[in-house]
Amino acid sequence: MIRHIELRLLLPEKESFRTDMAYALYGALCHCMTPVLADTLHAQKITPVRQHLRSGPEPGQCTWVLDLFDAAAELENTIRSWRTIDLQCCSAPLQVMQYTAFAPISVSALLEKGQTWPPASTAAEFLFETPCTFKVAGSYALFPSMELIVQSLWMRWNALMPDCTLEDADAQHLLLSGLRICRYRLSSRDYKLKGQRIPGFVGSVQISARLPAPMMELWHLLLAFAPYSGIGIKTALGMGAVRITPVIRKSNVSWQQK
């Protein structure tokens, strides 16, 4: 199950919004963990927490978006109790203006979401809200490839949804054979982390799919999953947040995470 939570936060006076403040928020979250939970999360290959900051909806405000997977579910009660959040990078505490918890999301709910993908769609648009990157042979990849995107989603699914893993390597290869990046609008963007700058990218890519029906169903499942899991590295620290919408010519049909 996935627990999707959003907190509207009021920034201290004269404090500017920065996406990398999400790293400090994750630090505040870790500070409240029990030693047992902290050890459990750090032992995971992929941290079962994905979070990022989104600006607005009003000046001086931002929205903290979190997705908690089963191993981190107990954090929901901690987050719900917060009224202020102290961050070392801010001159005063952030005020919690609103807390919203959405209905838990199961595998079956993701399958149903994938089945609502519009048949008239010609592609899927990935909008990278926060800097995204991949680690390849010890270096950061400054541009996404189809293989890197699919491998990231595949690995995250298997780590975060262990009761319904994708074990067929041939299926991954077949999926990749029918996908291609058909358009992109990206720019370089660093993410500040522990005094370092992680090179990445933001913007959008459009991915077209020509797949047999079973593979198309799998692709749509991964599209439904991606906004909750994130893509690339350090998604628990605020990187790799993505929104996905169908590309439908001469139409404004919306298919977004709720």
Could you describe each region identified by the protein language model?
Residues M1-K258:
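RNA-interacting cores
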